[in-house]
Amino acid sequence: MPKRLDINTILVIGSGPIVIGQAAEFDYSGTQACQSLKEEGYKVILVNSNPATIMTDTATADKVYIEPLTLEFVSRIIRKERPDAILPTLGGQTGLNMAVELAKSGVLEECGVEILGTKLSAIEQAEDRDLFRTLMQELNEPTPPSEIVHTLDEAYEFVKEIGYPVIVRPAFTLGGTGGGICHNEEELIEIVTSGLKHSPVTQCLLEKSIAGFKEIEYEVMRDANDNAIVVCNMENIDPVGVHTGDSIVVAPSQTLSDREYQMLRNTSLRIIRALGIEGGCNVQLALDPYSFQYYVIEVNPRVSRSSALASKATGYPIAKLAAKIAVGLTLDEIVNPVTQKTYACFEPALDYVVSKIPRWPFDKFESANRTLGTQMKATGEVMSIGRNLEESLLKAVRSLELGIYHLELNHLKELDKETMKKRIIKADDERLFIVAEAIRQGVTKEEIHEWCEMDFFFLQKIENIVNMERKVKANVGDMEVLREAKEMGFSDHYIASAWNKTECEIYATRKENGIMPVFKMVDTCAAEFESATPYYYSTYGDENESIVTERKSVMVLGSGPIRIGQGVEFDYATVHSVWAIKEAGYEAIIVNNNPETVSTDFSISDKLYFEPLTIEDVMHIIDLEKPEGVIVQFGGQTAINLAAKLAERGVKILGTSLEDLDRAEDRDKFEAALTELGIPQPVGKTATTVEQAVAIAEEIGYPVLVRPSYVLGGRAMEIVYRQEELLHYMKNAVKVHADHPVLIDRYMVGKEIEVDAISDGENVYIPGIMEHIERAGVHSGDSIGVYPPQSLSAKVKEQIIENTIALGRGLKIVGLLNIQFVVFKDEVYVIEVNPRASRTVPFLSKITGVPMANIATKVILGKNLVEQGYETGYHPEDNEVYVKAPVFSFAKLRSVDTTLGPEMKSTGEVMGKDLTLEKALYKGLVAAGISIPTHGSVIITVADKDKEEAIEIARRFHEIGYNLLATAGTAKSLTEQNIPVQVVNKIDSEDYNLLDIIRQGKAQFVINTLTKGKQPARDGFRIRRESVENGVACLTSLDTTRAILRVLESMTFSAHTMKEIAPTTRHEVVHA
């Protein structure tokens, strides 16, 4: 069937900000889909609220709207643009829910817009638990015994019949939000209540737990002619019971017999046909390891996290083809872009093993509940490819960037058998490592299997790794053993420590003895046809398939897995850098290991190496390719941290030199540079012992900001107000010694300003200055940023521009730099300088129209700013106002404190733009998921130091008609100022108290500032968590509260009594 000619304009709905459960995979699929539709000659309109992505670049679609993904705003765009159709299946859960909402509101019918890809009925059949169950019964496909409930009482009835454990799955939610496994009544009450709250239709499915079955996924495609194929099947190493986004996954499946494989394949194809999906779809199945009994767990009628993984694992571009199918093309008409010879109806074949390991945020959230269940907690993932499972798994472990080079964690060596048993039974993020540790300590595979039901095949593979460790240790210097260990994926780092040598020595020994990897191509067809993809992985074997060309090449290091503090913004900069390298006439080589991103799409660079970002793995590629140099400033801290090791090995680092990178990152050298340039900074010193830290803090005076040097995303930073807090920090947050000093600064309560600039060492061009709404002390990634700045005097702005130019020149920066200033009593101080791409590059590039990463790359390659048409100075400001607002994933992470501070906590960002600050803020807040009702109640409980500021805020809430609720202490200070307030009980009171008000949805906002002494037992922590669990906006910064007030005041009309007319006396009347 040829493509449809009755439609011209297609609206593509993006997936919005990055949250846990919906990360960069939709930037990748959305970008592919838009390009794919444009190739076919359609006019593409895109709406998405996330400014950090390639997808929202103006080149991706014909028209790009960065607006909130709400019914109100999307409807407005549909009425204005009048598209013929919308394609929602590439925008994740957000896109699907949006399509359902638009259809129900009647706007699609009113404007004559049809839904492409997956019909509305199919979305509802797959997402609505009741309809899905009915469909499965019609197809005679088994699902676990289950019951749809709308209330807690209905849940009790079901459990009486079926018994514990049961799994709770809320309808229409993302990444299992609100769901979980219940083993007893207490858990049932908590999880069902939370599930009903999170489901937009107040509906949960309760099903008998089949935890322990094998979890298998099939990624399938179907077209309008009913051709259907399996692109990839995957197996979770973790059995059913852990969310697939939190599971370690291998592809192709490793433990299925042919009969099992075909049985599940047929089921998957039968389901996609019954749903009538045209495009991609993901089917999750549970298989009893001891019989042929299986159950269908769920179906995602859209492109998903698994399809991004399947695309990268096979090389078969699912999203690109799903978009073509949506407009009527069929699989037998579409050429597979990888081989450029075969058609898309050939099922991919793999001659390698792929492993995916999730990347969790627990290194940032020490207190979070680490247990894994049916609710997803990972922020990102890594993928690696090898010729055997052991190699593939160990490469994935190295890719995680947790400073781990092997399947072992030192702190687990102390665990006794009982503790290991507990942690293996109840899965957490370290289970794989604990299993390896248990095998090392002689626990049998049978016992481990009994604890966690992991398949014996996988346990055997882990045992093979442990046996090889013993062999390596027993045969120091044996070349045959070295070769065997390398074939199994062992790192030089591990072998070096076992043989008591340095990593460089092991590398050199291997080189002398010819034990070096070769690079193999990913070609979708197991080398059956010739292939045109420059997409490679390393392994130890015979033939090298990566052909080095005559052209000069430049290598860019990517930023690895998405985690808090290092998000999709860095991938954006990486991709733009690669494009600029190609424009400059070089061959662009990229090294990265994140399957979700645009940068790991083989069509972006000239050569893609899917490898861990460790010194050993990167050096193998450099030895083969011999590039002109390596660019490290776009890969976040990951790449910067490799710079010194690369330079030691004689690799040329392009851009800012290593000495200058160090001058910006090393505290003492940086201070010296600032003093030399005459630029002020907050008083601060470096401590290498606890005693020193105490003395410094006494000298400069509390409050002080403490942090380790060389960090990203403000890890382990804190503001401390007195000595015992400082001691607590030094003991718990950091291990201080001469190599890892701790920085102690005077904390200034000032306005924070952020600047991004491009420097060629001589000229410095400043695209934009951003003002933060939250005062200094809240991490810049968690602050609301505003461009152009709204409250800076001309003098201060001038000072900021001068300082930026002086720093670019003085630090000899070549490429990008990002500076954070604090303005305190009208004086400008420098807090820090980052000599690399920052997380604001995409945002500023889009709003100023200055392609920062592109210009910076060309500067790095030797073309100065003047030659590119840019002068030293500040880019003219726009008359529109742009707001960048952070988005958090607290609902997914139990027991994490939501207070904002110097440690970054947000996972994503959105943008709001309009003609006034108030309107732009409104859009930014709404896009970030904060509802802004014009009336209601606000609970105010603040720390003593904030009482004065809170009075003015309370008065403004009262003026616009909000009802004020406060606990006794805060209420007293409000009453004294004649502000009417209703006193509510503190949370330790038995009677109706503050938490009850939040639980019953009777408060629209909660304003709660931190009382120091961060034990979770504190009232504040419980108030903040309760707000998150109940979807109430909880404001922990009075600056954010003021911003929301500005919006509310601009939306509501004021109501004031008339002025009294003063009585006039006769002689005041003037006669004409």
Swiss-Prot record:
Family designation: Belongs to the CarB family.
Binding sites annotated in the UniProt record for ATP 2: 707, 746, 752, 777-780, 820, 832
Origin organism lineage: Bacteria, Bacillati, Bacillota, Bacilli, Bacillales
Binding site for Mg(2+) 2: 298, 300
Protein name (record): Carbamoyl phosphate synthase large chain
Binding residue positions for Mg(2+) 1: 284, 298
Description of how the protein assembles with itself and partners: Composed of two chains; the small (or glutamine) chain promotes the hydrolysis of glutamine to ammonia, which is used by the large (or ammonia) chain to synthesize carbamoyl phosphate. Tetramer of heterodimers (alpha,beta)4.
CDD domains attached to this UniProt entry: MGS_CPS_II
Gene name per UniProt: carB
